[in-house]
Amino acid sequence: VDEHLAAVRARLLVLSEAAEAAGEPLRWFEELYAGAARDSDEIPWARMEAMPEMVEWVAAHPEVTGRALVIGCGLGDDAEWLAAAGFDVVAFDLSETCIRWCEERFPSSAVKYSVDDLLEMPPAWMNAFDLVVEIHILQAMPEEIRDVAVARIPPLLVEGGHLLCIGRLLGDRIPTEPSPPWPLTRTWLEGRFSNLDSVLFWNFVRDDTPGIDRYVGTWKR
């Protein structure tokens, strides 16, 4: 891990611990984005390109079309890719600074960006999306919030809609990095989405982070 990334992660840890202690465990998202001052190198998960595994999955499933929702959209690359692929996209994040940053990066975007909370989403979003994308969001939440938040996801799907989740997998290897993120187990994920039909679950590692197990999971309503 390079020194800059290590410093960014250390700052993230300080912010998240302070937020947890203050009883506002998700406050650090806005603090991290605001403190970055539009420098994406200060956001450890900002790839500045669409998630390759999402791109691969969507390309392999041309029958999945229509309205898409990106949960915790970050700097917007996944949402923009989906819009370019023909989806009618809504993308939200808890951080207002993050959403303003998206709007500045993509001023003529077709994506509908909004500041929203997974725990308190607009009623109009229920039963409204053909594809819901969750990448690295559940794993960034402390367990007590995650258990509540994950239950909010399946009702977003229309009948026949697909859920695509990508994140860090807790398997046999003990994570060496401090949390967040908190890697998730396949058992936990499948238990939380047991009211959906499991379509696919596979794990992988990236060449640049061989010590981190990751997963792609898809479910259908």
Q: Can you annotate each of these PLM segments?
A:
Residues 1-125, 141-221:
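Class I (Rossmann-like) S-adenosyl-L-methionine-dependent methyltransferase catalytic domain
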Residues 130:
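Conserved acidic residues
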Residues 133:
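A conserved beta-strand element that flanks and buttresses the S-adenosyl-L-methionine
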Residues 136, 140:
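Short catalytic micro-motifs in class I SAM-dependent methyltransferases
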